Design a protein with these regions (language model features):
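Conserved small/polar residues in nucleotide/adenosyl-binding loops
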Residues: 2, 7-16, 493-501
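Bacterial Sec-dependent N-terminal signal peptides
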Residues: 14-40
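Proteolytic maturation boundary segments
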Residues: 38-63, 250-338, 342-344, 403-407, ...
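Envelope-exposed proteins and targeting segments
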Residues: 49-51, 57-59, 71-75, 135-137, ...
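Active-site-adjacent, His/Asp/Glu-enriched structural segments that form or flank metal-binding
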Residues: 69-71, 79-194, 212, 222-240, ...
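Scaffold signal of the M16-like zinc-metallopeptidase fold and its non-catalytic homologs
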Residues: 103-105, 130-135, 151, 155-158, ...
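Acidic/histidine-enriched alpha-helical segments
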Residues: 110, 114-118, 167-185, 196, ...
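Structured mid-domain segments that build the active-site/substrate or prosthetic-cofactor binding neighborhood
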Residues: 319-399
Length: 501
């Protein structure tokens, strides 16, 4: 979707109750109470212009015709697997495997995959790329000139090979060890080092504590090639894979080619279960302070954890309603934070809030505040954003603030609707990848425009103020401060207490 997505409303019981309350508020304007309580939350429609299917082996595909740009298409394969699936002796292998997808497949040995794509204008590292994260791995071949003879067939064949036919040659594996070691040595930024330090404390006692995708160089430099092959065979399988093709193509023809090309990949009998690991709650705040000589400024993260919306609960209109509500909350709070930057001596350099995954975990969300502080007044910057969050929790927002934020939200939605025929391939691809990986809704802008314009006027500011009280509570707080390693710079110890508003 074009609009910023925010989600989550506290623990499961409170979220379900609040969704029902919001739906009642929306219906009450046109129904009597008996009709209201007889209603069930309707499902979110799926955009009729995307074709979605699933092969017998479990592989899912998404296909959409889009002519911007003309004669171009994007080809993606998303895997519901990342570094969280690694065992201790495999740390770094999800990322290593991503590298190996460009170092030899059954139909594209050696470097021929990159060579072929660059011959037709698809540049490695630009239009040909991939990423590995905690819970997912995604590969893309973008901006492909589909009017080039054989380009469509070849790109689908590449996706097929990534899915099931990597060669994983021992010599190529050994060559790649040094490449990844150099990447680890030269590309690890100060923020990445901070994140590695944060994980064990933020996720103590869980699988997330030691799952940074780059892994450990001890494993990367010493694992046996068969260990990588075992990981590939166990986790790269059709029931965890989704193909996305969007562009100036014939949808029927692409669907036929996908069925022909991918149906021969066998489903795995007795396949390992793909687990989604929980995140522990904490009654007392978790406080982290770290320094790095390459960190340019003092930055503080304030996380207020809450339960993530389960995948199966994202299919009804209530999820769009909570998304709308939480987005408006963060927009109003950010407007307040931005106002404080307009004074003669602002308390911080930058501050914002949002609601999304709790750092790296999809099973927990967090209402998150970020503040970049002045080095000579760190405590004021931190206390100011904490005070504004607490003020919003205790006293909520005014009708004037809400009217202004709602109007701005609806203006953005109107603009997206009016320009719906100008969307490029990448924006559709991102939506479909998120639908496959996380079950995020894909109603299409026309359906979303209709639904939001129906429900937004019926949701009062009092409902949003109730939600704010559930997003920020006295438990499940995590505060992390990161600053430069600089002589004379003192970082506060952060004996954390909620400030008075």
């Amino acid at each position: 979707r074009d609009l910023v997505r925010s989600r989550g409303l506290g623990d499961v019981y409170k979220r379900q109750h609040l969704l029902r309350t919001l739906w009642i508020v929306a219906l009450i304007v046109c129904c009597n109470f008996q009709q209201v309580f007889a209603q069930q939350l309707p499902p979110i429609p799926i955009d009729k212009d995307v074709r979605i299917g699933k092969l017998d082996n479990g592989l899912t595909y998404y296909i959409r015709k889009n002519s911007l740009p003309a004669n171009r298409a994007d080809f993606y394969i998303a895997q519901k697997v990342g570094s969280i699936q690694e065992e201790d002796n495999q740390r770094g292998l999800a990322h290593f495997l991503e590298h190996m997808c460009f170092n030899g497949t059954t139909h594209f040995p050696g470097n021929s995959l990159i060579q072929y794509l660059e011959r037709i204008g698809v540049k490695f590292g630009e239009n040909l790329n991939a990423y590995t994260s905690i819970d997912e791995t995604v590969y893309n071949i973008s901006n492909v000139p589909v009017n080039t003879p054989g380009a469509i067939d070849s790109c689908l064949l590449i996706l097929h090979d990534w899915s099931n036919d990597l060669t994983l040659d021992t010599k190529e594996i050994d060559k790649e060890r040094g490449v990844i070691n150099e990447e680890w040595r030269t590309r690890m930024s100060a923020m990445q080092r901070f994140q590695e330090k944060m994980l064990p404390a933020m996720f103590a006692g869980t699988k997330y504590a030691n799952c940074f995708p780059i892994g450990t160089m001890d494993v990367v430099m010493n694992f046996k090639p068969q260990t990588l092959r075992d990981y590939y065979e166990k986790w790269y399988r059709p029931d965890l894979q989704g193909i996305v093709v969007v562009g100036d193509i014939d949808v029927d023809a692409i669907e036929s080619l996908i069925k022909k090309r991918f149906s021969d990949i066998p489903a795995q009998p007795n396949a390992a279960k793909r687990e989604y690991y929980p995140v522990n709650d904490n009654q007392e705040p978790i406080v982290l302070v770290a320094r790095d000589k390459e960190q340019p400024y003092v930055q503080t993260f304030i996380f207020n954890k809450h339960q993530a919306t389960p995948r199966e609960e994202k299919n009804n209109v209530g999820y769009l309603m909570q998304d709308y509500a939480v987005t408006l909350i963060t927009n109003m709070l950010n407007a307040r934070l931005n106002e404080l930057l307009q004074v003669a001596n602002p308390p911080y350099i930058y501050a914002t809030t949002y609601d999304d995954d709790f750092f790296v975990a999809k099973t927990k969300d967090a209402f998150t505040g970020i503040v970049v502080c002045k080095e000579d007044n760190i405590e004021e910057g931190i206390s100011t954003i904490l005070r504004e969050i607490e003020r919003a929790r205790q006293f909520g927002f005014t009708e004037t603030e809400y009217s202004r934020a709602r109007a701005e939200y609806l203006r953005h939605l109107e603009s997206a609707f009016q320009e719906r025929d100008k969307r490029k391939n990448e924006s559709y691809v991102k939506e479909y990848v998120r639908h496959f990986l996380d079950n995020e809704p894909i109603p299409g802008i026309a359906n979303e425009y209709t639904i939001i314009n129906q429900i937004a006027p019926a949701i009062p500011v009092t409902a949003l103020n109730q939600i704010m009280q559930q997003l920020v509570t006295d438990s499940n707080q995590v505060v992390a401060l990161f600053g430069p390693e600089k002589e004379g710079l003192s970082l506060p110890c952060l004996l954390y207490t909620s400030p008075s508003p």
